[in-house]
Amino acid sequence: MKAHRRHIREKIVQALYTLDVRDTDTATAGDWLITPEISKDPKAIRFFKQLLGAIVDNREEIDQYISKHTFNWDMSRIAIIDKNILRMAMAEILYFEDIPPKVSINEAIEIAKKFNSTDKSSKFVNGILDAVYNDLNKSGKINKCGRGLIDQSSNLKKNKEKSPSDDQ
């Protein structure tokens, strides 16, 4: 049976939670949560390890992006689950060129609904990720390649701003 990415993302959030509340290393936290479904699928295990590694290796940078958009919230006050859902989505947006940002944001919202640390978790996660995405998009820091990965509305807007004389 093929492991679904949502299942993998949920396990990533759980591994990050484990790292926050227990004295353990990344490999151990990840190994505890790799299900047989994930371990039998080479693509799934690779995605799991790459995503978890990207979050752990770039946590400081990811947290800076999140902090910049949590105006009245100190990072220490954000629920651990919500913080780790945000970190997971941010890692995908920043470091995974093959995953559309809208997919990362939607997956984070759905996972926030499932884990539901508060009754407003999904709205909080949506608001922060939307603000970060818009900021990154405006500053040209979204680096996505492949068909369907770039927000088409951004491309249309850029093309409309370009005058016909620019092509000559």
From Swiss-Prot:
InterPro entries named among the record's database cross-references: NusB-like_sf, NusB_fam, NusB_RsmB_TIM44
GO biological process, one term: DNA-templated transcription termination
Domain of life, per lineage: Bacteria
GO molecular function annotations of the record: RNA binding
Gene3D superfamilies documented for this protein: NusB-like
UniProt keyword Transcription regulation, yes or no: yes
A Gene Ontology term for the protein's cellular component: cytosol
Keywords noted in UniProt: RNA-binding, Transcription, Transcription antitermination, Transcription regulation
Keyword Transcription regulation: yes
Family the entry assigns: Belongs to the NusB family.
Role: Involved in transcription antitermination. Required for transcription of ribosomal RNA (rRNA) genes. Binds specifically to the boxA antiterminator sequence of the ribosomal RNA (rrn) operons.
NCBIfam families tied to this protein: nusB
Protein name from the UniProt record: Transcription antitermination protein NusB
